[in-house]
């Protein structure tokens, strides 16, 4: 296995031809790494032997321990790209607006290889500049046109009329990296943007469920205890650095750390409820952050929010909310937000502590860093 360093803004020039060779079987397995992350090379054992059918090793978005490295075959990557194009209405040109060394960016590049097109790339190493979107989208030319974003990028684009209008010209804007707040989705729909909510991870070659419906060839189950299991042609072979218990232990299936529900059995629409390791145990009840965040997000003064648990002597954990207040809005009180949440959820889920912040910490391609919030506000509580 070899490494390919990807300097900011150079994915199309460096990574696209390498992917073409890897997918065609003429080059050994590849791991794409940013130039500042030399430590990944040793952790993923670059230069050592790997199975012949592995095309890409992709780092996962975990926050602790050594990188596991999902081993993706050319067959899995091709199946994912083909199924995505089938669902979206056919191959097209792609705007690369997420980091190319994460699975979302790599998936854009693989789809481009399969489609025989060259993506237009935005350099997002210094942040997502929405003023560059109109020109970048214009450069995609004619035919079907797509991009993949995270919710925070979509929210930022919606603040700029020209960027909003440009996104509305695309055939689909895939949103991944975690759930998108309902107000953002509603605003995008009102602006004529075709949003496709995706669910997936490095272990599934990227998004494998679109708007709750699995792509062709993808299978879903909900296990005892509520965890989502994913099977099918897009699965990784396993991890470069195996873990115990092994989520790939059941042949043909990957057991995720996500909790979900399937409407009308295994062939129905998937609702992702949250991560098992983020559940809050409070007063004998279990509260998942995501439904509480969805409820908070409908309050007119809340522009962004995150929910997490902090240790509590009486309850075990208490539900805590950190919010970013919308422009021109007075900060809501804790009592007002508790009442707002209790209109749609059990009062147990209503936050017992509120923090107003300027921005939420994020990791990877834009996921909220709850662990950072826990560290910050647990420290304040101890003072």
Swiss-Prot record:
Record's Gene3D superfamilies?
Answer: 3.30.300.30, N-terminal domain of ligase-like
Q: What's the top EC group for this one? A: ligase
Pfam families in the cross-refs: AMP-binding, AMP-binding_C
User: Reaction catalysed?
Assistant: 2-succinylbenzoate + ATP + CoA = 2-succinylbenzoyl-CoA + AMP + diphosphate
- The EC number(s) attached to this protein equal 6.2.1.26
Record keywords: ATP-binding, Ligase, Menaquinone biosynthesis, Nucleotide-binding
Extract the signal peptide range.
none
Q: Cite the GO molecular-function annotations of the record.
A: ATP binding; o-succinylbenzoate-CoA ligase activity
Q: What is this protein called?
A: Probable 2-succinylbenzoate--CoA ligase
Originating gene: menE
């Amino acid at each position: 296995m070899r490494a390919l360093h990807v300097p900011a803004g150079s994915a199309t020039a460096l990574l696209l031809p390498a992917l073409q060779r890897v997918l065609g079987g003429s080059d050994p397995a590849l791991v794409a790494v940013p130039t500042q992350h030399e430590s990944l090379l040793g952790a993923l054992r670059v230069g050592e032997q790997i199975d012949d059918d592995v095309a890409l090793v992709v780092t996962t978005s975990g926050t602790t321990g050594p990188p596991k490295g999902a081993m993706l075959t050319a067959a899995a990557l091709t199946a994912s790209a083909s199924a995505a194009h089938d669902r979206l209405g056919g191959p097209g040109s792609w705007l690369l607006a997420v980091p190319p060394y994460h699975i979302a960016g790599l998936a854009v590049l693989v789809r481009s290889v399969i489609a025989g097109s060259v993506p237009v790339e935005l350099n997002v190493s210094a942040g997502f500049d929405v003023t560059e979107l109109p020109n970048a989208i214009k450069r995609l030319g004619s035919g079907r046109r797509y991009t993949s974003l995270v919710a925070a990028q979509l929210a930022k684009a919606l603040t700029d009329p020209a960027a909003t209008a440009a996104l509305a010209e695309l055939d689909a804007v895939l949103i991944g990296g975690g759930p998108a707040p309902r107000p953002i989705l509603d605003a995008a729909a009102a602006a004529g943007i075709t949003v496709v909510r995706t669910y997936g991870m490095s272990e599934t070659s990227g998004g494998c469920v679109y708007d709750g419906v699995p792509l062709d060839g993808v299978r879903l189950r909900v296990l005892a205890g509520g965890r989502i299991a994913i099977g099918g042609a897009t699965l990784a072979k396993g991890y470069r650095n195996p873990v115990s218990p092994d989520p790939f232990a059941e042949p043909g299936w990957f057991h995720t750390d996500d909790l979900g529900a399937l409407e009308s059995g295994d062939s129905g629409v998937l609702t992702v409820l949250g991560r098992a390791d983020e559940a809050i145990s409070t007063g004998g009840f279990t509260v998942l952050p995501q439904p509480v965040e969805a409820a908070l997000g409908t309050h007119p003064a809340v522009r962004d929010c995150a929910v997490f648990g902090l240790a509590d002597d009486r309850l075990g954990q208490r539900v805590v909310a950190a919010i970013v207040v919308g422009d021109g809005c007075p900060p809501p009180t804790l009592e007002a937000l508790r009442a707002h949440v209790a209109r749609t959820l059990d009062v147990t889920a209503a936050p017992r502590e509120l923090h107003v912040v300027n921005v939420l910490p994020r990791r990877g391609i834009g996921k909220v860093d709850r662990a950072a919030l826990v560290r910050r506000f647990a420290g304040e509580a101890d003072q």
